[in-house]
Design a protein with these regions (language model features):
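HTH-adjacent hinge/linker in prokaryotic transcriptional regulators
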Residues: 2-99, 110-115, 119-120, 132-136
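Short glycine/serine/threonine-rich phosphate/pyrophosphate-binding segments
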Residues: 105-109, 212-215
Length: 265
């Protein structure tokens, strides 16, 4: 079996099962464990799965239970993220003071922003650099740097947030359910998200359809605390729900374009 064929089979098996061990993959594919480990290295580098001790985990499952690095997240559901961010970008007005959460979806939004008088604040180093490269006004909140996500976190971050009053804000999430609301896996991340959302007049959470119905470890806000903007294969129970906007490929909400700073419902 050629290496690329074996790796494709490994990626498919891990995707189907959510998690697989090196020994199980070796037995199923008739390859040595050392060969499987090398294949997992290649697949991890290609962002097709996440290599963990003793095996591998599907990206979607890993995203709910551990912090993926930003490169791991960039390739996930790119089309859906683009649709979400196109809609979100239309919400930013020239007089807004906008909070931008750390994460790949919100960073993608930053890359789509047009020149504006609006001011921005973020706890994401990478998002701050995107904004600065566009010549936009950006405040970088202090705190301890989390290398995997390039986010600033901790009490210094939440104290800085408490000084500001945001007119608009955008957050990411690992999962969202009606019962648990918006969830992440890290307490420090949840604390920063909650603190910023509490200081925001018009909060939006950006999450592609793969995160709907998924629950991570810690709730940072109930579902009704923010408008959810989503895209992709959205289940029927989420469509038409109050506070949920489904964006199409052109960045238009399911009930029409954004008007007067509020999304179509």
């Amino acid at each position: 079996v050629l290496a690329h064929e074996r790796q494709a089979r490994i990626a498919a098996l891990v995707g189907e099962r959510g998690v697989a061990t090196v020994s199980d993959l070796a037995a199923e594919l008739g390859a040595s464990e050392s060969t499987i480990r090398r294949d997992l290295d290649r697949l991890h580098e290609a962002h097709r799965l996440v290599k963990v001790h003793g095996g591998a985990m599907a990206l979607e499952r890993a995203h709910l239970t551990r912090d993926l690095t930003l490169p791991d997240r960039y390739g996930l559901h790119a089309g859906e993220k683009d649709a979400i961010c196109r809609l979100a970008a239309t919400l930013v007005g020239p007089d807004d003071f906008v909070y931008l959460d750390a994460g790949s979806t919100v960073e993608a939004l930053a890359s789509l922003l047009a020149p504006t008088r609006a001011a921005f604040a973020t706890n994401s180093v990478s998002t701050a650099l995107v904004l600065a490269a566009k010549g936009l006004r950006v405040i970088v909140l202090g705190g301890e740097l989390v290398d995997a996500t390039k986010a600033l976190s901790g009490p210094d971050t939440t104290e800085a947030i408490a000084r500001y009053n945001f007119t608009l804000g955008f957050w990411g999430t690992n999962g969202v359910t009606a019962e648990a609301g918006f969830t992440v896996q890290d307490r420090g991340e949840a604390a920063v998200k909650s603190a910023a959302l509490a200081r925001c007049a018009r909060p939006y959470v950006l999450a592609d359809a793969s995160k709907l119905g998924k629950r991570s470890l810690i709730t940072y806000a109930p579902l009704e605390a923010a408008t959810l903007v989503t895209a992709g294969d959205v289940p029927a129970q989420w469509r038409g729900r109050e506070g949920v906007v489904v964006a199409d490929a052109a960045g238009i909400g399911d009930n029409g374009p954004v008007e007067d700073g509020e999304p179509g419902r």
